Amino acid sequence: MRGLFVGRFQPVHNGHLKALEYVFEEVEEVIIGIGSAQVSHTLKNPFTTSERMEMLIRALDEKGIPRGKYFLVALPDINFNSIWAPYVEAIVPKFDIVFTGNSLVAQLFRERGYKVIVQPMFRKDILSATEIRRRMIEDQTWEELVPKSVVEYIKEIKGVERIKMLATDLEKNEKELQTPLRIPEF
């Protein structure tokens, strides 16, 4: 049996891995859909699809999950909820069951006749990508919330620096740069 699990993975964290561990116990193969695949270099979606794929591969390798047990599939947004499930069906290989922590995703796939297992979020108070990005911006400890291999990769690609840059008020900085210098008169 093949399952579907969709996330944005901005970045991959221990909550994602906990959910995926459960999915791998339930099915032989997993399709991991990488949502918002067309978006990167924004505060909400700082990492590219290929960077998120690399994070997933490294994290699953670290957990000892064989690469032959999963597929990674990029899922660009369509912003049209009523046709999102058939859109996903058209992009990914055939699947039998959907695993999600999102009630809308659950409803959309139930309407298509799929069995859906709604997973409780594991420590959602701290194991959320939003919280991890916030900690990065504020120079707080974030490393224990993500797999070691993902910490290493984020450092390799200077991901924290990217997120901090995205969090700055670029518009204000641009205006300051374009303001003519006033030379004081003596």
UniProtKB/Swiss-Prot annotation:
Region forming the signal peptide: none
Catalytic reaction(s) noted: beta-nicotinamide D-ribonucleotide + ATP + H(+) = diphosphate + NAD(+)
A Pfam family of this chain: CTP_transf_like
Keyword Cytoplasm: yes
InterPro entries xrefs: Cyt_trans-like (IPR004821), NMN_Atrans_arc (IPR006418), Rossmann-like_a/b/a_fold (IPR014729)
GO MF, one annotated term: ATP binding
Gene3D superfamilies: HUPs
GO biological process per UniProt: NAD biosynthetic process
Enzyme Commission identifier(s): 2.7.7.1
Annotated family: Belongs to the archaeal NMN adenylyltransferase family.
Name this protein carries in UniProt: Nicotinamide-nucleotide adenylyltransferase
Native source organism of the sequence: Thermococcus sibiricus (strain DSM 12597 / MM 739)
